[in-house]
A protein has these predicted regions:
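Catalytic-core regions of hydrolytic enzymes
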Residues: 1-9
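His/Asp/Glu-enriched short active-site or ligand-binding loop at hydrolase and phosphoryl-transfer sites
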Residues: 10-12, 20, 26-63, 97-109
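Divalent metal-coordination and catalytic microenvironments
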Residues: 14-17, 36, 70, 93
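Active-site glycine- and acidic-residue-rich loops that bind
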Residues: 18, 46-50, 77-84
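Short beta-strands and strand-loop turn motifs
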Residues: 38-42, 69-74
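C-terminal domain-boundary segment and adjacent tail
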Residues: 80-110
Length: 110
């Protein structure tokens, strides 16, 4: 509701911050017809912590499985190596037969 009120953007997707949620929060999300989205913990490359591009890429490469959702952050001022890691990861994952989709796209396929 905050996004709509503040920015005029409407969504029905909810990612619990840090992956932490309560049953009450899930119940309320369901009442509001939100779909909650969790990511694959094994692929958490901690890109938000200033991790190098090579470590981000290798963490995901080693731990990736079909159907995983990878959580990456678009920027952390002065510390983000995520874009550089994606230049490594995308060609590698495509060569391994993986494909990419948005979270909204995954839900629209249900």
């Amino acid at each position: 509701l905050y996004l709509k009120d503040e920015f005029g953007v409407e969504t029905r997707l909810l990612r619990p911050p840090g992956g932490c949620f309560t049953e009450e929060a899930l119940k309320k999300a369901g009442e509001l017809e939100y779909k909650y989205v969790l990511w694959s913990w094994e692929t958490d490359a901690r890109d938000w912590a200033g991790t190098s591009a090579s470590v981000i890429a290798s963490t995901i490469e080693k731990n990736m499985h079909g159907g995983d959702v990878i959580l990456l952050h678009d920027s952390v001022v002065g510390k983000s190596h995520t874009a550089e890691a994606l230049r490594i990861l995308i060609p590698y994952l495509l060569s391994e037969g993986y494909s990419f989709d948005t979270v909204s796209g995954l839900f629209s396929e249900e």
